[in-house]
């Protein structure tokens, strides 16, 4: 069984993430969305909230599972018995960091391959950071996130 692990902070999960997850769900038997605790990033939403939002966004995909984690990714991927890391590349600027990360992961988990997918063109400019900034300033984010995520952001930034 081909199991792919798609790690990220997902703060919040966007339609760009959702696009990659849907496509991965067609390519792999089982997709694990690994929501990282990432305390150094000081996330807007708690780990539990980010897991719940990712579950809501992916509930229509029967072969997708959402799991939170706070351990070393190389250990977590083995624990989850995944054989592929999935990473998204929005632009060339993402490649250098992702290439470095893939090589480090190869050292730490040599049996796990890294696979890169680019988002559909209509989502290539979306980032969680931009979504948070637009939401914080009262902008319309409905084109960029699932309605449940838009509601959570509106609640978070209530004035």
UniProtKB/Swiss-Prot annotation:
Gene source species: Pseudomonas aeruginosa (strain ATCC 15692 / DSM 22644 / CIP 104116 / JCM 14847 / LMG 12228 / 1C / PRS 101 / PAO1)
Gene Ontology terms describing biological process: coenzyme A biosynthetic process
Protein family: Belongs to the bacterial CoaD family.
Role summary: Reversibly transfers an adenylyl group from ATP to 4'-phosphopantetheine, yielding dephospho-CoA (dPCoA) and pyrophosphate.
Enzyme class: transferase
GO cellular component terms attached to this protein's record: cytoplasm
Gene behind this protein: coaD
UniProt-listed Pfam families: CTP_transf_like (PF01467)
Disulfide bonds: none
Protein name (Swiss-Prot/TrEMBL): Phosphopantetheine adenylyltransferase
């Amino acid at each position: 069984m081909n199991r792919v692990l798609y790690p990220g902070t997902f703060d919040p999960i966007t339609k760009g993430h959702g696009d990659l997850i849907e496509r991965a769900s067609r390519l792999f038997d089982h997709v694990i969305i690994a929501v990282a605790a990432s305390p150094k990033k000081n996330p807007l939403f708690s780990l539990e909230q980010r897991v719940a939002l990712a579950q809501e966004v992916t509930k229509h995909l029967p072969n997708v599972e959402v799991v939170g984690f706070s351990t070393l990714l190389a250990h977590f991927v083995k624990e989850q018995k995944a054989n592929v890391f999935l990473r998204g590349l929005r632009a060339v600027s993402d490649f250098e960091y992702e290439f470095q990360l893939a090589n480090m992961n190869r050292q730490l988990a040599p049996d796990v391959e890294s696979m890169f997918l680019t988002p559909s063109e209509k989502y290539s400019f979306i980032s969680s950071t931009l979504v948070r900034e637009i939401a914080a300033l009262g902008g319309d984010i409905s084109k960029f996130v699932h309605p449940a995520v838009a509601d959570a952001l509106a609640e978070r930034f209530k004035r």
